[in-house]
């Protein structure tokens, strides 16, 4: 019972050893005694939590970085998921939850197993066949019931390469999130996008999924056999500034690009913006992956929380009223946002607090 608990590693004296402080089931520290000798068993199995990642974005150096032939251009530039800003995506597949830390593994939490159980790696689940081992984002195509992985690792022979392809879109067989092998008897497959250097993010809209690269916008629509999905390039001049910088409301998909705001509602259109210079002349591009879009549908608003140039954390917002076609901005730190619907009022998070918005008359509702 002493060892069969969750522990935090205290020290790592060598590459192959670590220490922790033993405790009883009440949390009280315990020490070894004579009766412990010979009672430890011949081996100990440990299950480890995944690395928490970083709280800042690190700009990679290497291929495509800087000017042609200078500095580290042409060298390996990949950063591991553990050594990069930790961003999560998740989506429901039926009653189960599929989750993915950007650039890391893909996990599934099974609702029937109860809240006391943890999510497990999808590729190691019994019955899994050629499930991607890494990805940039996961989405479930709700109407046709396919699991989609943006930025998956490709299939090489009879296995996955375990090396992320930032432009590869992989999708499972219909109604089966464990089957990713493309066969004539199923609808699994993959498509590699061509415009851009990496997929930045994707959102689900009406009857389609909008996928953004760093330079372009694609529409992904279910078309059935033999192709399953059609991926159409719809714009090449408006990449997404960060994975969370797009949001869907009743009038379209709104997103922040580099130096401008756009809306997609059948075609991509640049939004006239009276505060454009204020926002983009004082924004921390190096932490753009922290930018996140939000909706406040009751007030016909879409907006973005972003870090100013002097901050590595979110400290500002800009809002667009989709009915009145006006912009407004301010200073506020919010790192997550849930619009009303499931809850009565919008909920937002920052600095260990959850705030309820659009209620009361002060800034601490």
Model-derived segments and spans:
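Short, conserved, GDST-rich strand-edge loop motifs in beta-rich repeat architectures
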Residues: 152-170, 198, 307-309
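Small/polar beta-strand repeat architecture
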Residues: 2-86, 114-120, 124-130
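Beta-propeller blade signature
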Residues: 162-175, 316-322
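Hydrophobic or amphipathic alpha-helical targeting/insertion segments
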Residues: 95-118
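Surface-exposed loop and turn segments in beta-propeller and other repeat-based domains
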Residues: 51-77, 125-128, 174-195, 274-287
